[in-house]
């Protein structure tokens, strides 16, 4: 943890400022100690350089462990090798630029950016490298925050936090840009998680989310409906199930591709990872465009831009 992160975070219980207690510093990094609220005295550990600002409960523990295992397997290349959900690194950066209408990353100098649900930190690191003049904060609920921290530790403009997005340890009106792709629909209450993120944006700042649409029908979501309790399976069984389901779908896709009725983006490993992604979480919600637009307007956002590049809901709003 870098010392200047303390000025960017706050107590999730009362919003008070944090002080450092028993901090041990190694090569300009705070590697252990505690963050203690100066108002309510709540404290949270710094573990191997990672601030862990969480409260535990049984339901959230299951979700945290599930996504932690998923990202660890991806990092170990047990699914895809060089892509995430079939996308290469440059495609992730292009999506980020398009979502916010960014021309050049150099224009982000001085901006504070939140990657809300950063997973293992691949995109977080790529954004920080592309925009070295910006400050990038990655937050994830799961143990994958440790992977993100290891990946980003040498980048001077990145901070990683393990925290709950429904109770973020971040002050209102802190961020110029908030990016949250495929994350808040896996929380117990999507609208509540959105309501926790929305106030964090500065005036004229932008908030982007990507979540599942109620209108979309796909083999992945059909599998989720049929196997809705699959998240209770042991991880090895769930891993095997994802690959088992992927094989016939991949074969069918290749046949369609050979007949030139479609161009299939995903390779077999990406298909298996997508099945694992929909079967492993306890929570998975879908919403309508009208519903999501209402969330943005309720929190003072205008200029909504819905992407046409996905059948799901990808939308960016500007804080008025």
Which residues are covered by each model-predicted region?
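Conserved N-terminal segment of class I S-adenosyl-L-methionine
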Residues: 2-171, 284-285, 291, 303, ...
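A conserved beta-strand element that flanks and buttresses the S-adenosyl-L-methionine
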Residues: 179
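Hydrophobic adenine-recognition pocket in adenosine-nucleotide-binding enzymes
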Residues: 183
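A short glycine-rich, Lys/Arg-flanked "PGG" loop and its adjoining helix->strand segment in the class I
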Residues: 191-203
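Conserved class I S-adenosyl-L-methionine
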Residues: 206-237, 247-251
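Short, glycine-/aromatic-enriched active-site segment of Class I SAM-dependent methyltransferases
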Residues: 217-226, 265-284
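Extended, charge-rich helix/loop segments that form flexible
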Residues: 234-270
